[in-house]
Amino acid sequence: MVSIGHATLGDTGVTVLYAGPQGAVASVDVRGGGPGTRETDLLEPHNTVERVHAIVLSGGSAFGLAAADGVMRELATHDIGFPVFGEDRPGPRVPIIPAAVIFDLIVGEVHYPTASDGAAALRAALSDAAFAPLLEVSGTVGAGTGATAGRLRGGFGAASVTAHAPSHDYQVTAYMVANPAGEVVDAETGELFGARAYERATGESLEALDPEAYAAVPDPKHAKLNTTIGVVVTDAPVTKAQAKRLALTAHDGIARAVRPAHSPLDGDTIFALSDVSAGAASADAPAAAGVDTPTMMALGAAAADAVEAAIVDAVVHAAPGFGLATYATLPKRA
C-alpha cells in the first residue's frame, strides 16, 4: 500500500510516496521544457527495472533532488532495494528512488531541501499516520509549500476518481504539486479552469473569484520558471508500458487545469504507479500481465480527471503567506 509523508520547511518542502519494501511497477512521462528529474530514464518501458520503492517530489529546484539521496540511504538501512544479484543470493540492494522538483526559489528565503529532509519525509511516510485516508492533507504542505499557480499560491493536492472498466472498477488517485507558470483561473469569469472536475471528484461546489479582484492581483513570477509534478496511483495491475501510457494520458489533466500548460519553462512531470499487493511479489519479479485496452481507456480518462481535480485541490486549500494571493482569501463573484 502506498503511503505518503511530508517534510514542510517553511518556504519549501519534500513529499515522499513510499511504495512498500517490494516496490511497485511504475513509469513516467515528462512534458515540460525545463524538467528537473532523477531516474526517469530508468522508468522507460524498454529499460530493465520494473519497480520503484519510493517517489520523491521536492521544492528547491535542482538542489531539491538531494532529498532523494536521503530517502535512498534511509531505505538502505532497512535492507530495502533492488537485489542486484537476485532475491535468493546475498548482495547489495539498491533502492530505486525517482524524483522530480519544482522551482520555488522566488518564495521566501532561498532554501534547499536536503537529504536529511528527504529522510524525514520518508519516516513520516513509514509512520502509522501515513496510512490514514490519503486525501486529507492538501494545500501548503510538503513539496507544495513554496508553490505558486499563476497569480495565486499553489500547493500540494490530491483527488481520487473511479475508473469504470468493463469488467472491474479501479481507483485512480492523483497527488499533484501545482506550481505552473500558466494560469489556473479564467480571468474573464473568475472560475478555476478545473472547477468542474474538482466538483465531480469531491462533491463540493466552488465559487468563482471576482474577476476584477483577480485582475488586480500582481503576478509574482518575475521569471516564469515553474513546474507541475505529481504521481498517479492506481490499484489496477498495469504493466510498466501501460503505466507509461497512464502517465502520458494523465497530462491531459494538466492541460485542462492550467493554461498554457507544458511550456518551455515548465518541467511538467507525472509518474504513474501500480499499487497492487506489492508485498506479494519480489522486487525483481516480472511485471503483471496487464489490463485490456478498454480498461486502459477507462484508467486514462480517470487519471486525467484526477490530475485536473488535484491541481484545483492544491490551489483551493493553499494557505496565505509570503504576500501571495490565495483562492480562499480573494473576493468571490457575486
Where do the protein language model's features map onto the residues?
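A structural signal for small-residue-enriched, beta-sheet-centric alpha/beta enzyme cores
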Residues: V2-D69, R73, T77-A334
